[in-house]
């Protein structure tokens, strides 16, 4: 069975004048339910304050929790922060952390939300409030794990790179469209900047050729995977040209590289944008099911 972490509060009401698809997580949940007995559901707890503040400035954390984020920061995030959004922002990092803990026991687990890689120390950005990847990685590192964050979203994981820079137990990898958001890039442990319009074969070659040596150099205990589907050719905010089959091949490649090294992997959904929310949700679900199928029956080394 595939371990999937989900919380009812992942599905928050839509915000006015926001380009973020608030019903995407509900569609992901419903499609995964259709998979029936192949899914085992887990519900996360809210991430404790100390870990939110381990990644983010305490003043910004308080602004979010108390739903008093300044308008300038809300504009940068892309939607207003009300009490329901603030609650969701605290639960999603708990989901990514729980997925990681489950992966350490089972080989693979997925958070049905998360991947908020643009959130920075003092502010959110790009539809990201708190950086669940950085928060979970810092907590796992404090527990003695070496973590590699692999970010395959079409946008660079700038917030994740900035929040974990210099941490001796955390490394970051980002493969993204060079000319896409954010305009000002951070420095990951390894950045792979791709030209516009790159298709399946060239993308997968670049991914395999760059991620393989990084895995061998960093020797992590766990991979946190940002499995954004916005490299898809028709994505509203993407600049790459991957097909649905190319995305599936991407998941198989990432899974194979992890399995060959005995590494557990926890995934988050990341980005995916367009008018057809159901089609986007299907891509996210295909990623989870593909990763889960790859890890099924694999005996990873004990950690």
Where are these regions (language model features)?
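Acidic carboxylate-rich catalytic motifs and surrounding loops in phosphoryl-/glycosyl-chemistry enzymes
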Residues: 39-49, 266-275
């Amino acid at each position: 069975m595939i371990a999937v972490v989900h919380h009812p509060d992942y599905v928050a009401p839509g915000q006015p004048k926001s380009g973020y698809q608030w019903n995407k997580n509900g569609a992901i949940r419903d499609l995964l339910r259709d998979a029936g007995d192949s899914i085992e559901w887990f519900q996360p707890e809210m991430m404790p304050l100390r870990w939110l503040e381990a990644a983010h400035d305490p003043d910004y954390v308080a602004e979010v929790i108390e739903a008093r984020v300044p308008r300038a920061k809300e504009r940068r995030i892309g939607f207003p922060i009300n009490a329901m959004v603030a609650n969701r922002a605290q639960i999603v990092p708990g989901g990514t952390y729980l997925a990681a803990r489950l992966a350490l026991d089972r080989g693979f687990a997925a958070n049905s939300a998360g991947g908020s890689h643009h959130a920075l120390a003092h502010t959110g950005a790009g539809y990201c409030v708190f950086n669940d990847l950085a928060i979970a990685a810092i907590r796992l590192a404090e527990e003695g794990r070496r973590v590699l964050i692999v970010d395959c979203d079409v946008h660079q994981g700038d917030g994740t790179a900035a929040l974990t820079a210099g941490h001796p137990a955390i490394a970051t990898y980002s493969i993204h469209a060079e000319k896409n958001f954010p305009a000002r890039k951070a420095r990951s442990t390894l950045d792979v900047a791709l030209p516009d319009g790159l298709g399946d074969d060239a993308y997968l070659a670049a991914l395999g050729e760059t991620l393989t040596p990084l895995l061998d150099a960093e020797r992590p205990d766990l991979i946190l995977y940002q499995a954004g589907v916005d490299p898809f050719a028709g994505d509203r905010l993407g600049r790459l040209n991957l097909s649905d089959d190319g995305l599936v091949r991407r998941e198989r490649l990432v899974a194979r590289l992890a399995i060959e090294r005995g590494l557990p992997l926890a995934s988050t959904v990341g980005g995916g944008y367009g008018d057809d929310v159901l089609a986007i949700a299907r891509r996210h679900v295909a990623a989870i099911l593909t990763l889960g199928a790859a890890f099924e029956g694999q005996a990873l080394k004990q950690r």
